[in-house]
Amino acid sequence: MSWFKRKEKGITTATEDKMDVPKGLWYKSPTGKIIDAEELARNLWVSPEDDFHVRIGSAEYFHILFDNNEFTELDANMTSKDPLGFVDTKKYADRLVDVMQKTKLKDAVRTAVGKSKGRDLVICCMDFAFIGGSMGAVVGEKIARGIDHSIKNKIPFVMISKSGGARMMEAAYSLMQLAKTSAKLAQLAEAKIPYISLCTDPTTGGTTASYAMLGDINISEPGALIGFAGPRVVRDTTGKDLPEGFQTAEFVLEHGFLDFITPRKELKDKINLYLDLILNNEVR
């Protein structure tokens, strides 16, 4: 027995009138688990069935770490230039304009200061959506200024890395940022101000070779890709099969390059715990 009976046969709908399910309502994890997008956001963008940590950007990390999502962004309008007149498949200057329009970001890092569990904190967070989170002159300068703000105001510093490495379109200008940010972190250490480095998926290239591995405590989200050259490059170069889980956060932790792996739900509590322990403050 059917619940509904068609009164008229041969009814057709024009293609332009057909309605598809809107994009963004569902998310499918790499293991095939499907989750409602709103539920995913409530779960801090972590798939509840398989614990897969979805890549997120600075807006989401600021929401997670700052109290009531209240913060002041530093150097918000700083943008990259094209000193070399670089051209690959398109002009670098045009690429910058396009990606700024697409992502609504000014560059691949944002710096903000606000309260986390009631105490001041400076956070620099990278955005992979902006040219693969690549590190150019503006990224290095914003990180350096964020560190300066920490030193001047004696505020702990947190760096959230999510990057493919140096920005090839800026050549040596990009490579200079490795030395620049590392030197600034040395000044931060001399000032005895704590620095927590959070590696997220992916943390590779010059980012790994500089500030991402220089924290007083280096932590990572589960399953993050962490390395210098990516696994495909290593495999093609060496001609050898790679160990199981090569360059995952768990592999890197096992080999001593990380201190802890921290699930996203625990980030705010754990980061503040580490800072309290370093500063010998009462644990919040």
Curated annotation (Swiss-Prot):
Q: Output the Gene Ontology cellular-component terms.
A: acetyl-CoA carboxylase complex
Pathways involved: Lipid metabolism; malonyl-CoA biosynthesis; malonyl-CoA from acetyl-CoA: step 1/1
Q: Which NCBIfam families match?
A: accD
Q: How does it assemble?
A: Acetyl-CoA carboxylase is a heterohexamer composed of biotin carboxyl carrier protein (AccB), biotin carboxylase (AccC) and two subunits each of ACCase subunit alpha (AccA) and ACCase subunit beta (AccD).
Supply the source organism for this entry.
Flavobacterium psychrophilum (strain ATCC 49511 / DSM 21280 / CIP 103535 / JIP02/86)
Q: Which reaction does it catalyse?
A: N(6)-carboxybiotinyl-L-lysyl-[protein] + acetyl-CoA = N(6)-biotinyl-L-lysyl-[protein] + malonyl-CoA
Which GO MF terms does the UniProt record name?
A: acetyl-CoA carboxylase activity; ATP binding; carboxyl- or carbamoyltransferase activity
> Which residue range or ranges hold the CoA carboxyltransferase N-terminal domain?
24-284
The top EC class, named as a word, is transferase
This chain belongs to the protein called: Acetyl-coenzyme A carboxylase carboxyl transferase subunit beta
Q: Which GO terms describe its biological process?
A: fatty acid biosynthetic process; malonyl-CoA biosynthetic process
